[in-house]
Amino acid sequence: MTAMPFPLLSSALSSALLPVSRRLLAAAVLGCAAAQAAAYPVTVRSCDRDVTFERAPTRAVSNDVNLTEMMLVLGLKDRLVGYTGIGGWKTGTARVRDALRGVPELASQYPSLEVLAAARADFYLAGWNYGMHVGGAVTPATLAPFGIRTYELTESCSHVMKQSAASFDDVFRDLNNLGRIFGVDARAAQVVGAMRARLAAVSRAIGHPAPLRVFVYDSGTDKPMTAGGLAMPTALLTAAGARNVMADLPRSWTQVSWESVVARDPQVIVIVDYSAVTAAQKQQFLLSQPSLARVAAIRDRRFIVIPYDAATPGPENVAAVETLARALYPAAFAGPAR
């Protein structure tokens, strides 16, 4: 592909932006963060529920790669009896698979009640549409009789309660709450502090640009799946100095019409990379649609790719902001290292 202002980012560049995250995951896998003494019971807020823990869970199950990375970055691999929902969606990377070596995947997609009970789990880290469906067989209420307490991903709470726009505060809240639940408060504070510092560095670098209009393309052909105002990419784009053209939709991940994409004329398209359909195939599909030919991002071939675990709430979100900011405003990063 010829050079262009907003190229399809190479894996090499993406990797270069992840050193801190790699060190955090490595520390987690090596067990460098010992659990601090914690006073139990502890009570945390999970969506619209208060959840009390008499002691730290010892047989946890996490669903989805982003939530599993939260456990790893907090040094909690030894508390995992298993994980779910990574292999079936093809969201895992070699780095994550290596970090999870020795921990079984109990279900390739959403786990059943029977799977969680058979694992003798005492804790389920999931979210609405991240391992649970409203009204489904696996919910906090259905797990409780089995002694399984559930913590819900804050971003996903919009499915069960009124929620404001997604923000990094949601991710920080989840990490800090997990720190309290497992008695690793200091480790959680360290992780959150490192994330805040990297976000501040991006903000200093880009200053206050006129926000570019961005459409997030997750998947779909007849109707695209995208991020509304309540989904994490809205916060990622804001932190990177851009604007999600679907931010006014009071929904999380949602389907829209192609007509609405054309009407909002994004200058850049962010492709979420996961599943059997590659990012390159998604880009080619977009370029092949006559109805999108006049959209600025299509006309100028302005695409950015971010992996699934960076687009959904978790420790890789800062890497996504760094990737986005460098691609959107390369001149801000062209000078000497800051």
What feature does the model see in each segment?
Residues T2-L25:
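Bacterial N-terminal signal peptides that target proteins for export
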Residues C32-A34:
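N-terminal signal peptide c-region/cleavage motif recognized by signal peptidases
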Residues V42-T43, D50, V138-G220, R301-R338:
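Extracytoplasmic substrate-binding proteins
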Residues S46-D48, V103-E114, L249-W258:
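Short helix-initiation/N-cap motifs at beta->coil->alpha
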Residues R59-A119, F123-M132, V245:
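A short, structured surface patch at a secondary-structure boundary
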Residues N66-E69, I86-W89, F123-Y124, N129-H133, ...:
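Solvent-exposed loop/turn segments at secondary-structure junctions
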Residues W89, T226-W253:
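Alpha-helical, coiled-coil/dimerization segments enriched in small aliphatic residues
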Residues S112-A126, W258-Y274:
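Proline-aspartate-enriched helix->loop->beta-strand connector
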